[in-house]
Amino acid sequence: MAEKILENKDPKLEAMTVDHEVSAPKPIPVDEPTLTRVARPLRHVRHIPVKSLVFHSKHGPITFSYENKIKLPISKNKLVVQVNYVGLNPVDMKIRNGYTKPIYGEAGIGREYSGVITHVGDNLTNRWNVGDDVYGIYYHPKLAIGALQSSLLIDPRVDPILMRPKNTLSPEKAAGSLFCLGTALNLLAQLKEKDQLNTESNVLINGGTSSVGMFAIQLLKRYYKVSKKLVVVTSGNGAAVLSEHFPDLKDEIIFINYLSCRGKSSKPLRRMLDTGKVVDYDDFNTLKETEDYTQGKFNVVLDFIGGYDILSHSSSLIHAKGAYITTVGDYVGNYKKDVFDSWDNPSANARKMFGSMLWSYDYSHFYFDPNIKIIPKKNDWIHECGKLLNEGVVDCVVDKVYSWKNFKEAFSYMATQRAQGKLIMKVEGF
């Protein structure tokens, strides 16, 4: 059949073309190509980037570094805190002074902070939560790490840390409280344990506007209830500063202006004991006022400035079986030269060993290491500090707050040793 059809071909049909009226297909719409940013899946993020303020030696500059990272997931016994504020302390400059050559790599700055928890280890979820406002101490002076970082990896078994009460303690004050308050609290507790401090103690404070000095004044009057007036050696405007911040205590303090006696504070102190009168001079050595003094020699001398002037006249100033405790040593503190953990001079070492026998009083150089593993468990100083701050028994006096971009200005001011209160650095988010 097919063969017959093929044999009967029609040439006209073969030459014909047929046009079909069919419309073209409708074009497919295509959106304009755009690029959009999407969040990286968390499973791909293996670390937390960290911005730090570091140095390499005391001769080199302080700079920002991006080398440090916090590995994820974190250890089950640790926390990550996003740092908002950091308190500066003289020990920061003393540690830097110990790095004479840039052979140790980067070294961090800052020993105390306030911030917000961003990561919680598995074993700590019953105590801490993401979003908790906290403050604490990050004290590792021999490990070349500091708190001036955008994020910190915290081990609560070593690093003191507390919840910050938002209504009673600002983040700025929280960042500058624990190191100096802890120093003052432990120093006075040591005197109390030795029966060298009680409500009838006559106390002399050398360096009343230092941060430790301010906390010591508050603790002596409000916590230890010392009834006698405190004799406080301070700078020309120190009396005004202390009176402004602690109006309830200004009548409980006898101020000695060391500038009016060319830094030899022992001279007006001895005159005060000899005459029974408190003579106050202004910066032009003009007599301002006189009041009676009947408290006698001192049971306790707290030195936060250093120097040998008061010690050289200790027999006429300090009671037998009294106590002289310093946080600096025989030499007047010099933030530009002093080195952390350096040896005391021979005379100071001799006083520590034989002071009670040769000079009839107890001499000690107090060092505060807030590492929780070092301090006995019965000494719950960190929570006691938190309670004192929360209840308003003590207050942190903040002198100035700097952005950490202005770190040069902050460290220059601290080097003058004229700060009257804490210097706080504001850490920007990263």
Swiss-Prot record:
GO molecular function: oxidoreductase activity
GO BP annotation list: protein targeting to membrane
Function: Lipid raft-associated protein involved in the targeting of PMA1 from Golgi to the plasma membrane. May induce clustering of PMA1, which facilitates partition of PMA1 into lipid rafts after leaving the ER its and transport to the cell surface.
Miscellaneous field: Present with 937 molecules/cell in log phase SD medium.
Gene: AST2
Pfam families: ADH_N (PF08240), ADH_zinc_N_2 (PF13602)
UniProt-recorded name of the protein: Protein AST2
Record's GO cellular component terms: cytoplasm
